[in-house]
Amino acid sequence: MAFDQDTVRRTAHLARIALPQAEIPAVADQLERIMGLVEELRAIETTDVPIMAHPLDLDQPLRPDMVVHQDQREVLMASAPAAEHGLFLVPKVIE
């Protein structure tokens, strides 16, 4: 599939990506290579391959649940843009 500069510009606009004019030819080349790989994958015969959710059929070992009390309020509040009395302040969304 060939990607001309207009297609790249339009795709970048739809994806809300700021793409400088100087980068458009390189991005077009990258998109063509990606689509080439997609075409190679489409050409692979998979009718005899069973459908699977994951290629490895392994169980996930889980640790037992343990109740642990950790007071991390100060650590969590430090990353909040606005907090008051130990609570997050959020913008009012309903008038």
From Swiss-Prot:
Entry keyword set: ATP-binding, Ligase, Nucleotide-binding, Protein biosynthesis
Record note on quaternary structure: Heterotrimer of A, B and C subunits.
Annotated signal peptide: none
Gene Ontology MF: a single term: asparaginyl-tRNA synthase (glutamine-hydrolyzing) activity
Catalytic activity line of the entry: L-glutamyl-tRNA(Gln) + L-glutamine + ATP + H2O = L-glutaminyl-tRNA(Gln) + L-glutamate + ADP + phosphate + H(+); L-aspartyl-tRNA(Asn) + L-glutamine + ATP + H2O = L-asparaginyl-tRNA(Asn) + L-glutamate + ADP + phosphate + 2 H(+)
One GO BP: glutaminyl-tRNAGln biosynthesis via transamidation
Source domain of life: Bacteria
Gene name tied to this protein: gatC
EC number in record: 6.3.5.-
Protein role: Allows the formation of correctly charged Asn-tRNA(Asn) or Gln-tRNA(Gln) through the transamidation of misacylated Asp-tRNA(Asn) or Glu-tRNA(Gln) in organisms which lack either or both of asparaginyl-tRNA or glutaminyl-tRNA synthetases. The reaction takes place in the presence of glutamine and ATP through an activated phospho-Asp-tRNA(Asn) or phospho-Glu-tRNA(Gln).
Cytoplasm among keywords: no
Protein name as it appears in the record: Aspartyl/glutamyl-tRNA(Asn/Gln) amidotransferase subunit C
InterPro entries linked to this entry: Asp/Glu-ADT_sf_sub_c, GatC
Entries under PANTHER family matching the protein: GLUTAMYL-TRNA(GLN) AMIDOTRANSFERASE SUBUNIT C, MITOCHONDRIAL
Pfam family membership, one: GatC
Family: Belongs to the GatC family.
